[in-house]
Amino acid sequence: MSRRGTAEEKTAKSDPIYRNRLVNMLVNRILKHGKKSLAYQIIYRAMKKIQQKTETNPLSVLRQAIRGVTPDIAVKARRVGGSTHQVPVEIGSTQGKALAIRWLLGASRKRPGRNMAFKLSSELVDAAKGSGDAIRKKEETHRMAEANRAFAHFR
């Protein structure tokens, strides 16, 4: 048995302008090669574009998009008796948000467009409306979990 204590779970800090943890999570996820100022720049430009497109609070659009993309359940590969089964498992809120942010950024990177701020803003607006690649990814994950429901007892 380990003598070390359990590590305290870190809480995400909030960003300087919107004072929001989700924005900070998004910034940390979009970050490449340690260029955090560029990541902030991209996010804030995307927020401005959302403000112009929808004429609503960009934070509420972001929250709605993440709420729409967050999965409730996912599948995990589990090896049982020589064969690998996709076992459906429930996802906690923190992990669900992290997955949602990852899917939103992945979908926006695949989008055709001028720059990342434009692509991200378009994807967030689409996700808030209930369409877009990230929403499709969530639905696909839920379908996979539903199809493999028979293996739920392997948890």
UniProtKB/Swiss-Prot annotation:
InterPro entries (alphabetical): Ribosomal_uS7, Ribosomal_uS7_bac/org-type, Ribosomal_uS7_CS, Ribosomal_uS7_dom, Ribosomal_uS7_dom_sf
Any Gene Ontology CC annotation: ribosome
Claim: Plastid is one of the keywords in the record: yes
Pfam families on file: Ribosomal_S7 (PF00177)
UniProt KW keywords: Chloroplast, Plastid, Ribonucleoprotein, Ribosomal protein, RNA-binding, rRNA-binding
PROSITE patterns attached to this UniProt entry: RIBOSOMAL_S7
N-terminal signal peptide: none
Family designation: Belongs to the universal ribosomal protein uS7 family.
Protein name listed in UniProt: Small ribosomal subunit protein uS7cz/uS7cy
